[in-house]
Amino acid sequence: MSNENRTCSFCGKSKSHAKHLIEGKNAYICDECVANCLEILYEGDNGGTPPENAGGEPEESGKLPTPAEIVANLDDYVIGQGQAKKALAVAVYNHYKRLRHPKADGGVELSKSNILLIGPTGSGKTLLAQSLARKLDVPFVMADATTLTEAGYVGEDVEQIITKLLGKCDFDVEKARHGIVYIDEIDKISRKSDNPSITRDVSGEGVQQALLKLIEGTVASVPPQGGRKHPNQEFINVDTANILFICGGAFAGLEKVIRQRTEKGGIGFGASVHSKDENAGITKLFGIVEPEDLIKFGLIPELIGRLPVIATLEELDEDALINILTEPKNALVKQYQALFGIENVGLEFEEGALRSIARQAMERKTGARGLRSIVERCLLDTMYRLPDLQGLKKVVVGKAVIEEGREPELVFES
């Protein structure tokens, strides 16, 4: 039977008159007949009509973790960033509370509060979003804003974000509708120039407009199993109204915009004089960011309006980077110790080595993201030889290994 001649095997409705026509073995059923079957089944089992959310919003199961419980879980994986964790926890708790109670007392409809994370590279933005999704056990997907393009241009369409989200939950639409999407590098689609006061990049603004529709809530049409779109194709429709969007970026140069607003400089004796090293004040300035600063930076007002929760992350200092190396559940040192442990070999980092690793990461301005490459480089030769080193008991990494490129100390069984 051709596509055009397909009809519902129960009511006879043609494909052109049905919203969806689901194919079975030698039979078809339309969406209306599916709804009628659901109603009949519910009446038979419960002696009444199906609830308002039957066939729609899934019943939520389990206790929703409180903001304090969410923060406690984040503390296991992310060092520091107390204020950002608190802001995220409250926003996420309110979001999923809203999904469980779409209308509050008095019929008040609760709006969605998407989140904007502002912080330096390697400060933990992505890790916070990943840890949130893990704690809540919801589908999670990451997207890079710099790879997105407007519809009609070569590149990744914004709706492909939803395709990826569906893929994370085996194309279960109901699960996807309650997932979390993290869009990284959101600041990179705002402007071309290093000067944040210059007018926005037009193509970047087009991507912002496309993202705006997705974030505020639209029905995205996704090809089955993530294939390419083509005419006469059945699509999976996903309502994005209940998907939580978290956008993040380093926003390099935003501190200049904030400083222009807060410090009224002048000429002569009354002029404001800034030191050459102004990095120390960036975290403090990010903490007082206003929507008008983001607009001047290059984000469109409509997009900022759909990201009402703004959380700022602090720049990580040397002590924080050392803690990141050793304290979290998935700390880098613990990961390498586990790798060496598989070969029944111990691994020890001396305090001086840890401090040198942290110092090098700060000099590279890569934050926590640069720690792994430094550790990997100093252990590369040892890991290469590890399977062939018979009787090796322990590997000790000292300060000289990091700073002078020496070999780690190898301790063999006596």
Curated annotation (Swiss-Prot):
Residues in ClpX-type ZB domain copies: 1-49
Keywords: ATP-binding, Chaperone, Metal-binding, Nucleotide-binding, Zinc
Keyword Transmembrane helix annotated: no
Gene3D superfamilies: 1.10.8.60, ClpX chaperone, C4-type zinc finger domain (6.20.220.10), P-loop containing nucleotide triphosphate hydrolases (3.40.50.300)
Any Pfam family hit: zf-C4_ClpX
Binding site residues for ATP: 120-127
A GO CC term assigned to this protein in UniProt: HslUV protease complex
BP GO terms, sorted: cell division; proteolysis involved in protein catabolic process
Positions of Zn(2+) binding: 8, 11, 30, 33
SUPFAM superfamilies in alphabetical order: Glucocorticoid receptor-like (DNA-binding domain), P-loop containing nucleoside triphosphate hydrolases
GO molecular function, one term: ATP hydrolysis activity
Signal peptide (UniProt feature, chain positions): none
Superkingdom per UniProt: Bacteria
Described function: ATP-dependent specificity component of the Clp protease. It directs the protease to specific substrates. Can perform chaperone functions in the absence of ClpP.
Family in the record: Belongs to the ClpX chaperone family.
Quaternary assembly: Component of the ClpX-ClpP complex. Forms a hexameric ring that, in the presence of ATP, binds to fourteen ClpP subunits assembled into a disk-like structure with a central cavity, resembling the structure of eukaryotic proteasomes.
Protein name listed in UniProt: ATP-dependent Clp protease ATP-binding subunit ClpX
Biological source species: Neisseria gonorrhoeae (strain ATCC 700825 / FA 1090)
Top-level taxonomy: Bacteria, Pseudomonadati, Pseudomonadota, Betaproteobacteria, Neisseriales
